[in-house]
Design a protein with these regions (language model features):
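Short secondary-structure boundary micro-motifs
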Residues: 105-106, 112-118, 134-137, 168-171, ...
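Residue-level recognition of well-ordered beta-strand positions that form the cores
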Residues: 128-134, 163-165, 197, 221-223, ...
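Amphipathic/hydrophobic helical signal segments and adjacent flexible N-terminal regions
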Residues: 2-50, 55-159, 246, 258-275
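Acidic/His-leaning functional-site neighborhoods
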Residues: 205-257, 265, 273
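Central antiparallel beta-sheet cores of small beta-barrel/beta-sandwich binding domains
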Residues: 139-230
Length: 275
């Protein structure tokens, strides 16, 4: 077997952390990765910018172009290499990506893989749900204020994956724009309790603990909330989740802010559209 030639990790083995750091131009120093070079080399940055501006470049102006193309290692060469790599992927999107070599998640409890026994108490939640909801708890406010899709799926292991996408609605029901995004996991425990971890796109991570209220209702409250400096000042939350007699997924979420006690934040009733 011929040994791999040139820089870069051995293609027959996974790259080491040191190899990856070298490829992206960094090294581990004092417990952190620090840059060792600028990924866009400065010897032709101005030349590349000028080329983009007027569609041409003159090697006499200090650029890295030669009669045979960009000088290897120059900024021009890096740009050209990136363009060539993009040719194979520029027309593709998420839906075009080949499937993973492992079973896909399912939101249908009748499909394989089977639901893990630990998740049986949460079985009614598994599915794809879509509907509308409202903010707060204003008297007389009955018009939907947002739309929402919730996907609760599994891969046969003892947890459920949770994803929520919402969109804001105008008073006439038309779409106003995108709303909140959440991803997380339900993790049922041997003692019957439930952990729910939720990450919010607005810069917050919540850890809920709770228990079943019945065979089709669950109550949870936050034990910990982490926020980035730019996130809303939410300091706690509760969620009551249940399946209604007519088969909808319904919930009420309360939130507490740094200067406001727990109060209703959102509520919705979602129809099962898959699962």
């Amino acid at each position: 077997m011929t040994a791999p030639q040139g820089p870069g990790p051995d293609p027959h083995h996974g790259p080491t952390a040191e190899e990856i750091a070298g490829l992206v131009g960094a090294e581990r120093t004092a417990g952190e990765y620090v840059p060792t070079r600028n990924p866009v080399l400065p010897d032709s940055a101005d030349h590349a910018a000028a080329s983009s501006a007027d569609g041409s470049a003159d090697s006499a102006d200090g650029g890295a172009e030669t009669a045979h193309g960009p000088v290897p290692g120059s900024g021009d060469a890096a740009i050209l290499a990136a363009q060539e790599r993009a040719e194979a992927t520029r027309g593709l999107d998420i839906a075009d990506v080949p499937p993973l070599p492992i079973p896909a998640d399912t939101a249908n409890v009748r499909a394989r893989p089977g639901l893990h026994p630990d998740c049986q108490p949460l079985l009614p939640l598994v599915g794809v749900w879509r509907g509308v909801g409202r903010f707060g708890n204003e008297p007389g406010q009955n018009e939907p204020q947002f739309g929402q899709q919730v996907v609760i799926s599994h891969d046969g292991r003892p947890f459920l994956r949770y994803e929520s996408i919402s969109w804001l609605l105008e008073p006439d029901g038309s779409v106003k724009g995108p709303g909140s995004r959440e991803v997380g996991f339900f993790r049922p425990q041997p003692d019957g309790s439930i952990e729910l971890m939720v990450a919010h796109a607005e810069g917050r991570i919540e850890l809920f603990y709770g228990r079943p209220r019945s065979t089709a209702a669950w109550g949870l409250s936050t034990d910990a909330t982490l926020r980035t400096p730019t996130a809303p000042p939410v300091v706690g939350a509760t969620r009551l989740i249940g399946i209604t007699p007519d088969g909808k997924l319904a919930y009420v979420e309360e939130r507490a802010h740094s200067d406001v006690e727990l109060a209703p934040h959102t509520s919705a009733a979602l129809d099962r559209i898959a699962g």
